[in-house]
Design a protein with these regions (language model features):
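Internal intein/HINT superfamily modules and their associated LAGLIDADG
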Residues: 1-251
Length: 251
């Protein structure tokens, strides 16, 4: 299994997925991994399915579909792959969900009533600051591409301003690490109302950094609808008087 793909997948799950634990009627614990995307991005779910060779795609409604890895597939296919490559989730919520799953596997706990109140952290990496993430998480760039597929935006506004943004609720250290990947001229925006952080770039020199990252660096590529969005975004930049002198990838 391609480790770059797995790192990309971890980033996508951190953004648009969750590990769901439920108590069955007989008291046993069941875990499912769910990734939900817009139906226009069904191709991304199909791509992941083709790489993992496990999982099921279900239509939620007229807008969304989901890829589900059920209990056995999650525990005995995906988890061993992640552990063998030292891949861990980076957002607080997903890390907590994964810790619970790992605890039940390590201690062979099958019934809900046997779960302790406190679950240990299984990630061996400690992040006290954004530099820790950049230096210790060797798969961070592949992870970031996955998170962009989930939560990033390549946008062209009506006033012809063109930019790139990515945001998350909470996870301040993680967002600061993303900021340091590009070191843009605009500071991180924080919404007190939504408790969310946003890295947003529109300056010419910052847009060049974005192009360099997604077109010229060697990491996992964008896929699906986000790739289509990026290519359309590049076309918009080429037609813009402000941005057309940037260095672009060859067609």
């Amino acid at each position: 299994m391609d480790v770059s793909f797995l790192a990309f997948l971890v980033g996508l799950i951190d953004g648009d997925g969750y590990i769901f634990a439920r108590k069955k009627s007989n008291g046993y614990i069941e875990f499912n991994l769910v990734i939900s995307l817009h139906n226009r991005d069904l191709g991304t779910l199909e791509y992941i399915l083709s790489k993992l060779h496990c999982g099921t795609i279900n239509k939620i409604n007229a807008i969304q579909s989901k890829l589900v890895l059920y209990n056995y597939e999650l525990k005995y296919v995906l988890v061993p792959l992640l552990l063998s490559h030292g891949l861990f989730f980076l957002t607080e919520n997903r890390a907590k969900q994964y810790n619970l799953l790992l605890y039940t596997l390590e201690n062979n706990i099958k019934k809900w009533e046997l779960l302790p109140e406190v679950i240990p952290n299984y990630n061996p990496l400690v992040f006290n600051n954004p530099q820790d993430i950049l230096s210790k998480v060797w798969y961070f760039k592949d992870w970031f591409v996955g998170s962009v597929v989930a939560e990033g935006s390549f946008f062209i506004q009506a006033n012809k301003e063109i930019g790139f943004s990515v945001g998350q609720k909470g996870n301040s250290i993680l967002m600061e690490a993303i900021y340091l990947l590009f070191k843009p001229s605009r500071k991180i925006y924080y919404s007190e109302k939504n408790k969310a952080y946003l890295v947003r770039m529109t300056a010419v020199k910052d847009i060049q950094k974005v192009i360099n990252f997604f077109s010229f660096e060697n990491h996992y590529p964008l896929i699906g609808l986000k790739k289509e969005s990026y290519l359309a975004w590049l076309d918009g930049l080429k037609e813009s008087a402000r941005y057309k002198s940037l260095e672009f990838p060859k067609d």
